């Protein structure tokens, strides 16, 4: 068993049936095995190999030596000088101190396990784990190819892997105290890496797709690497030197690792994900991609945070996060949000959402420059967030949005608190967070400045709640440094009517809703003469008085009025077309007459309300239709004298629109009944003859009318949350008046059925209710219309035996600047 081989001996044949060989020679004196031209058993050494000597394998290229000894325990080197080596059992290389592989050599582990000391493989060699398990206990250098599946265990020492091993799918385990260095991102192939020791990637570039686990360290030097594997099981440390860029695009890429960053850590993702890792060092974090990354751990890194695209969120209201970054830059496509603290300064050119709960706080330890948009909390969801700037605030034409429960001085609100100075220009908008509007005294403080308050904060857009408009103003006296929201009228803007400076600013929409509601209740109202002109006509061929016919009238009007505060002036223009037809007529005694008819109508009303307090305007419109019945009775159907009664009832339906300046458009519907009863008495007061044979008869007709208006508008909630309730329907309007008209007939028209009736009419109208709108708890009403005086001038004429025309103009005057001018043109065709 003590056979040896050396330079002066012929050697041992591999196929000798020896049971044990003790290796004593080393280097050039090592036992050398070759299997040139041999296969099967002839190329297999099954003897036990023991001793401290080396084992050399020297077959020609492509020829294979197989080792199958079960109890090999030699401790020398294994030198694969040429050819191939095939393992047929576990640990056939004994306790070899090292495995050396020359160029073009191949080791096939063939599914078996082997522990070696050091591995040294030359470029061009191939170590195929092939489902086996290779343990390296003393590091080494692998310049050849590592291929196959199985396990590669680095127990100790420094193991340097050169180049790419894309065909290696084995799991690599780096034990605590061991180190593996790579110069290619695929140095350990595609298999899992259990890094309880140190994995060092030096000057590598590309995607690291291996799944990492363990508690050790993975370091990157002079590298540009994108993590692509599932590293959820890695809880060690990722280290970046100052010349390294490391990209992560999902939470599993970083696992539970702490990150020591001296370079650039790039968070790039199209999706949202949460980063629980702590980051230290003096390197930078760069956010790219449209997704949002939420940081849930405090980080002590002091480098720059550059949000180039997408969002970076710091914690939540109940779990704020501190970021020690000395400079945070938010680009135009970037967003910073959350609750917590940035110890450094922030330059915002994108979107900065400070606070994300009911009362979140965000603190900026340095200065804040706002060139983009800042939102305190999520817009419209809650009020009570605070943005605290320990340094100075500079507005570079940026914008801030506050959520405020718009009410009185005690209202909950978001707030900007600046411990230093303010400079520059900033636009401010406010979103109502459920407030119903109220009267303020000093106002609701939005911006508090401890230092010099040289910055200008200008209101952007309207701020409305309930019936009130709010304005952003600088405080007075000792509060001059701060900025407030107030519903109080500070300075009227050239008011058309004097307004008390202690009043509060009403929204013009209140006037518009009221104008719409008044329009739907009055649009189709009429009196007898509006509908039918001359009450009856004479058939010249028979001399009979007749009243059956089809009629149409068109009316237009312009109305102007103020609300009770005199801040709101409303003007409206209306067009109405109605048509109808008598469908039946008769007489009860041969002297009187009655008729029954149907009618329908279309109307349109446009109105505008302007606030003299704020200059804001609101526009409204109504489109509606009606259908109804009418009935008329005349006591005397022959000589135009005596008593008459007239009544009508209509059902109307309407589409309403309101558009406030800078506010969302609002739409709602109205529908309901209107009805009227009218009576009058016509008597002749005189007669005189004019020149050229004209006969003139003078008549007076006292009139009384009661009109009931019950068109209801739907209760409505505006987009800003204001509840709208319109009142005044149920109004009963009474009209008392008299018409004086002249019936003229010229002998030239005898036999032509032509006559004219110029008239003048005066009325007093009384309304039991005023039309108004309740906006949350504040009412805006139409003033001046409770008692109205009316004058009408017009003419009614029978043009031909079959055609009547009439027209008139009139004006109604009331208190508080109320006026309504109207014109009517009608025709009736008899058949």
Question: Model features per residue range: what roles?
Answer:
Residues 20, 24-27, 42-52, 63-124, ...:
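Surface-exposed loop/turn positions within long extracellular repeat scaffolds
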Residues 349, 401, 549-553, 595-599, ...:
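Residue-level detector of the transmembrane beta-barrel scaffold of outer-membrane proteins
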Residues 370-372, 376-410, 416:
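Long, polar low-complexity repeats
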Residues 493-691, 808-810, 815-822, 828:
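Outer membrane beta-barrel translocator domains of Type V secretion systems
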Residues 542-546, 585-590, 635-639, 683-687, ...:
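Outer-membrane beta-barrel strand-turn architecture
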Residues 628, 710, 719-831:
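Outer membrane beta-barrel transmembrane domains
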């Amino acid at each position: 068993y003590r056979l040896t081989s050396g330079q002066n001996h012929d050697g041992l044949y591999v196929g000798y049936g020896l049971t044990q060989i003790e290796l004593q020679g080393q280097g050039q004196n090592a036992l050398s095995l070759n299997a040139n031209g041999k296969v099967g058993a002839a190329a297999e050494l099954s003897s036990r190999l023991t001793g401290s000597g080396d084992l050399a394998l020297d077959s020609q290229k492509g020829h294979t030596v197989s080792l199958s000894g079960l109890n090999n325990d030699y401790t020398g080197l294994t030198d694969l000088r040429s050819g191939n080596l095939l393992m047929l059992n576990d640990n056939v290389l004994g306790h070899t101190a090292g495995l050396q592989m020359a160029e073009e050599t191949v080791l096939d582990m063939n599914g078996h396990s082997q522990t070696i000391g050091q591995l040294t493989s030359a470029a061009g060699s191939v170590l195929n784990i092939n489902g086996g398990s290779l343990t390296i206990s003393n590091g080494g250098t692998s310049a050849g190819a590592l291929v196959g599946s199985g396990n590669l265990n680095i127990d100790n020492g420094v193991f340097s892997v050169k180049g790419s091993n894309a065909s290696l799918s084995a799991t690599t385990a780096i034990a605590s105290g061991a180190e593996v260095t790579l110069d290619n991102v695929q140095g350990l192939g595609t298999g899992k890496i259990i890094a309880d020791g140190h994995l060092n990637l030096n000057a590598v570039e590309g995607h690291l797709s291996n799944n990492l686990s363990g508690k050790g360290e993975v370091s990157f030097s002079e590298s540009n690497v994108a993590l692509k594997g599932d590293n959820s099981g890695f809880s060690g440390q990722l280290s970046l030197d100052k010349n390294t860029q490391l990209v992560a695009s999902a939470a599993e890429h970083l696992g539970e690792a702490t990150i020591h960053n001296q370079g650039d850590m790039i968070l790039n993702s199209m999706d949202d994900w949460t980063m629980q890792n702590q980051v230290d060092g003096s390197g930078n974090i760069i956010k790219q991609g449209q997704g949002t990354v939420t940081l849930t751990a405090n980080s002590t890194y002091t480098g720059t945070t550059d949000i180039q695209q997408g969002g970076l969120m710091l914690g939540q209201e109940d779990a704020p996060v501190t970021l020690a970054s000395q400079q945070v830059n938010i680009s135009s496509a970037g967003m910073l949000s959350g609750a917590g603290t940035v110890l450094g300064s922030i330059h915002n050119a994108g979107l900065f959402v400070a606070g994300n709960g009911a009362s979140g706080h965000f603190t900026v330890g340095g200065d804040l420059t706002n060139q983009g948009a800042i939102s305190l909390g999520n817009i419209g969801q809650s009020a009570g967030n605070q943005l605290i700037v320990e340094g100075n605030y500079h507005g570079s034409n940026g914008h801030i949005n506050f959520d405020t429960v718009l009410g009185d001085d005690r209202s909950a609100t978001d707030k900007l608190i600046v411990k230093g100075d303010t400079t520059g220009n900033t636009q401010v908008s406010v979103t109502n967070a459920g407030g119903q509007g109220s009267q303020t005294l000093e106002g609701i403080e939005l911006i508090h400045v401890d230092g010099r308050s040289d910055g200008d904060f200008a209101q952007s857009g309207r701020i409305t709640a309930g019936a009130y408009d709010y304005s952003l103003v600088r405080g007075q006296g000792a509060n001059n440094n701060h900025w407030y929201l107030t519903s109080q009228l500070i300075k009227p803007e050239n008011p058309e009517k004097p307004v008390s400076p202690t009043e509060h600013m009403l929204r013009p929409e209140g006037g518009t809703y009221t104008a719409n509601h008044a329009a739907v209740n009055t649009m189709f109202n009429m009196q007898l003469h509006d509908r039918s002109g001359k009450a009856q006509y004479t058939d010249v061929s028979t001399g009979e008085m007749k009243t059956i016919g089809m009629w149409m009238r068109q009316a237009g009007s312009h109305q102007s009025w103020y609300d009770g505060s005199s801040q709101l002036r409303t003007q409206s223009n209306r067009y109405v077309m109605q048509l109808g037809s008598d469908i039946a007529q008769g007489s009860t005694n041969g002297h009187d007459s009655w008729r029954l008819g149907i009618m329908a109508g279309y109307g349109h009303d446009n109105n505008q309300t302007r606030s003299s307090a704020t200059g804001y305007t609101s526009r409204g419109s109504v489109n509606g239709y009606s259908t109804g019945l009418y009935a008329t009775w005349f006591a005397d159907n022959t000589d135009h004298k005596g008593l008459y009664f007239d009544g009508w009832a209509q059902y109307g339906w309407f589409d309403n629109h309101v558009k406030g300046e800078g506010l969302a458009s609002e739409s709602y519907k109205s529908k309901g009944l209107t009805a009227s009863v009218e009576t009058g008495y016509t008597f002749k007061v005189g007669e005189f003859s004019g020149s050229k044979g004209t006969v003139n008869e003078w008549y007076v007709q006292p009139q009384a009318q009661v009109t009931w208006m019950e068109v209801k508008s739907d209760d409505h909630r505006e987009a800003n949350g204001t509840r709208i309730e319109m009142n005044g329907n149920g109004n009963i309007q009474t009209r008392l008046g008299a018409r004086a008209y002249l019936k003229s007939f010229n002998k030239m028209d005898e036999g032509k059925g032509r006559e004219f009736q110029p008239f003048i009419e005066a009325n007093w109208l009384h309304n039991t209710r005023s039309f108004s709108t309740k906006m949350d708890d504040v009412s805006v009403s139409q003033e001046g219309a409770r008692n109205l005086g009316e004058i009408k001038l017009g003419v009614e004429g029978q043009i031909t035996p079959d055609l009547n025309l009439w027209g008139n103009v009139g004006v109604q005057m009331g208190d508080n600047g109320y006026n309504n001018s109207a014109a009517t043109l009608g025709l009736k065709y008899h058949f």
